[in-house]
Amino acid sequence: MRLTFLGHACFLLETSRARLLLDPFLTGNPAAAARAEDIACDYLLLSHGHEDHTGDALALSRRLGAPIIANFELAEYFAAQGAKVHGMNPGGGFNFPFGRVKLTLAHHSSSAEAGLRPIYLGSPCGLLIQADGKTVYHAGDTALFLDLQLIGKAGIDVALLPIGDNYTMGPEDAAAALDLLRPRLAVPMHYNTWPVIAQDPARFAALAAAGGHAVKILAPGATLEV
């Protein structure tokens, strides 16, 4: 299994049977390591409805015929625009041809902009992906909460955690989350895209190391073998 960081919270996860694009925000992303028009994937997985996580989902789904896997309301929102979808809800899992996806709880919000007010688009989620004998957890934009320890019981190989603060966990809370999740490895995300979420990932790595946790900092475009 290969994991490539494409910037912000977007990752390409390549399993032996499928290519999964997580939170596909490339167009308009100042940290993007790829162009949406150059991306190929078999599935699109969305943690919640905010534009910096869904930005290219509809265009990619239409171009590639790739189903969008997301919470029910978000899936229906894209289905109404012609996308193939598979709707789920937090706590539910489904066995896809490539492996299993379970949506986990996440404490955040989920909406799309529509004129002067946002449209509510279901519960924000984390993505727990099991394939090729490995487990990857994409935390979405969650805040720190105690029940992360229940998610950790899945035996996580790689946890993708936001560290940008302001909208999500900051470095301190993300390091505390590792005490609950206990993954084999953590990768920081959702930072330095804009000044409001500017962070030094080395500080997160140091806080994590003090708790006995391993961190791999990926520059946009870098790849990790899981």
What do these predicted regions represent?
Residues 1-19, 26-29, 100-102, 203-211, ...:
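Zn-dependent metallo-beta-lactamase
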Residues 12-50, 55-62, 73, 109-120, ...:
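Pre-active-site segment of Zn-dependent metallo-hydrolases
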Residues 13-16, 96-97, 129-132:
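Active-site beta-strand termini and strand-to-loop segments that position acidic
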Residues 21-24, 41-49, 69-72, 137-140, ...:
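Active-site neighborhood of phospho(di)ester-bond hydrolases with catalytic His/Asp-centered motifs
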Residues 28-29, 50-55, 75-78, 92-95, ...:
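Active-site environment of divalent metal-dependent phosphoester hydrolases
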Residues 55-113, 118:
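Glycine/small-residue-rich loop that forms an oxyanion/phosphate-binding "nest" at active or ligand-binding sites
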Residues 67, 79-93, 175, 179-226:
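Binuclear metal-ion centers of metallo-dependent hydrolases, dominated by the metallo-beta-lactamase
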Residues 113-179:
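Active-site-proximal loop/helix segments of hydrolase catalytic cores
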